UniProtKB/Swiss-Prot annotation:
Organism: Geobacillus stearothermophilus
Name used for this protein in its record: Inactive levansucrase
Main location group: secreted
Subcellular location, record wording: Secreted
Gene Ontology molecular function, alphabetical: levansucrase activity
Entry annotated with the keyword Lipoprotein: no
Domain of life: Bacteria
Cited Gene3D superfamilies: Glycosyl hydrolase domain, family 43
Record carries keyword Secreted: yes
Keywords assigned: Secreted, Signal
GO term, biological process aspect, one: carbohydrate utilization
Length: 473
């Protein structure tokens, strides 16, 4: 038994009892080792105070995902018999959409609507200048079933699904894909993975000619980012915990290569557990707010979920051969708020770095946020590594609250920077998979988001074609 850990837990339990009895102030003064603490671990935080402002703020139309006309929505004609959901474009090093021999390329998750375990990465392409949903073509899956075995990688051989990621057009004209290797064989183990995708072009089509340099990069170090073994040791699925290590987004800065990804904090930068409920840094604002909100949280049915909530947008540096060079601190964390901040995205625009993530209200512990609420949250910094401050004062960028059964339900919102101007294109998928016989999950209509320093707003009447990536190009 770890005696130090046991003593710390006992102290927390004593303080919890005091708070529940309404004796918060007395507990603060009784013993120094029972006092709340403030520890940022040198990273930025999505605070409870900021999130509690969102239910009122989200009523403003400038944060609301536009309403779409369901009668105009089409399936992707080339993706016959497939649901298509999370997608990401082939991007240049600066985040703008790459021109690959006259084509735009998108990678997307797709699968059989009748088989929830069928999740693979497909490639789609359209000629530059075309925007119609019908102009998207596909050569099919990126990987053959045998590729994971041919790679001679001890982790890859146990992959059962392919999850979201990113893709970059390298300086030597290659396509480098990053994605999440998911293994259903090992309690949902997730590994950041990469491969070079070889694509040949003609005047009328693109073809996939196999992959090379296919390898695992990172699966958590336990100290900075939770790994699957910690999840298993603490009770795996029965514990109520939600282990994440996925959605790698590639970014370059000052000649260095990085991946930013969805994760959970590790033992040295604010791990999950009851002790986290007493860290003022996770609450924000003031000591008086902390006292009020922490007591309320401890008495609520969300306290167990809150103590397990330690979502993070993590960061690692890569070597030039795309192997792991350095594990870095998270750019931001969501301790006590949510365990799941997805689709990490970061880009530089007009001298500022913008960081965004998607999250579901059903995974949150914030009063006033409902299970149907869907968000894109955003943050801004003067440097890639932070510190990051919330856009629009709270971090709210986009909100959507349609019933998941609605044909025009959207998720996985992703900001695509443009070559010039203050607008980004927002892409997403529409219609949840397997819900309709005739309506497949598909590219949602894109729309514009305007960014002015620390403020954003949805551009009115800016709905674009389904899956459209660029404007004025």
């Amino acid at each position: 038994m770890n005696i130090k850990k046991f003593a710390k837990q006992a102290t927390v339990l004593t303080f919890t009892t005091a708070l529940l009895a309404g004796g918060a102030t007395q507990a603060f003064a009784k013993e120094t080792n029972q006092k709340p603490y403030k520890e940022t671990y040198g990273i930025s935080h999505i605070t409870r105070h900021d999130m509690l402002q969102i239910p009122e703020q989200q009523k403003n139309e400038k944060y609301q995902v536009p309403e779409f006309d369901s009668s105009t929505i089409k399936n992707i004609s080339s993706a016959k018999g497939l649901d298509v959901w999370d997608s990401w474009p082939l991007q240049n090093a600066d985040g703008t959409v790459a021109n690959y021999h006259g084509y735009h390329i998108v990678f997307a998750l797709a699968g059989d609507p009748k088989n929830a375990d069928d999740t693979s990465i497909y490639m789609f392409y359209q000629k530059v200048g075309e925007t119609s949903i019908d102009s998207w073509k596909t050569p099919g899956r990126v990987f053959k079933d045998s590729d994971k075995f041919d790679a001679n990688d001890s982790i890859l051989k146990d992959q059962t699904q392919e999850w979201s990621g990113s893709a970059t057009f390298t300086s030597d004209g290659k396509i480098r894909l990053f994605y999440t290797d998911f293994s259903g064989k090992h309690y949902g183990k997730q590994t950041l993975t990469t491969a070079q995708v070889n694509v040949s072009a003609s005047d009328s089509s693109l073809n996939i000619n196999g992959v090379e340099d296919y390898k695992s990069i990172f699966d958590g170090d336990s100290k900075t980012y939770q790994n699957v073994q910690q999840f298993i040791d603490e009770g795996n699925y029965s514990s109520g915990d939600n282990h994440t290590l996925r959605d790698p987004h590639y970014v370059e800065d000052k000649g260095h290569k990085y991946l930013v990804f969805e994760a959970n904090t590790g033992t040295e930068d604010g791990y999950q557990g009851e002790e986290s409920l007493f860290n003022k840094a996770y609450y924000g604002k003031s000591t008086s707010f902390f006292r009020q909100e922490s007591q309320k949280l401890l008495q609520s049915d969300k306290n167990r979920t809150a103590e397990l909530a330690n979502g993070a947008l993590g960061m690692i540096e890569l070597n030039d051969d795309y192997t792991l060079k350095k594990v870095m601190k998270p750019l931001i964390a969501s301790n006590t708020v949510t365990d799941e901040i997805e689709r990490a995205n970061v880009f530089k625009m007009n001298g500022k770095w913008y960081l965004s993530t998607d999250s579901r209200g059903s995974q949150m512990t914030i009063d006033g946020i409902t299970s149907n609420d869907i968000y894109m949250l955003g943050y801004v910094s003067n440097s890639l590594t932070g510190p990051y401050k919330p856009l629009n004062k709270t971090g709210l960028v986009l909100k959507m609250d349609l019933d998941p059964n609605d044909v025009t339900f959207t998720y996985s919102h992703f900001a695509v920077p443009q070559a010039t101007g203050n607008n980004v294109v927002i892409t997403s998928y529409m219609t949840n998979r397997g819900f309709y016989a005739d309506k497949q999950s598909t590219f949602a209509p894109s729309f514009l988001l305007n960014i002015q320093g620390k403020k954003t707003s949805v551009v009115k009447a800016s709905i674009l074609d389904q899956g459209q990536l660029t404007v004025n190009q």
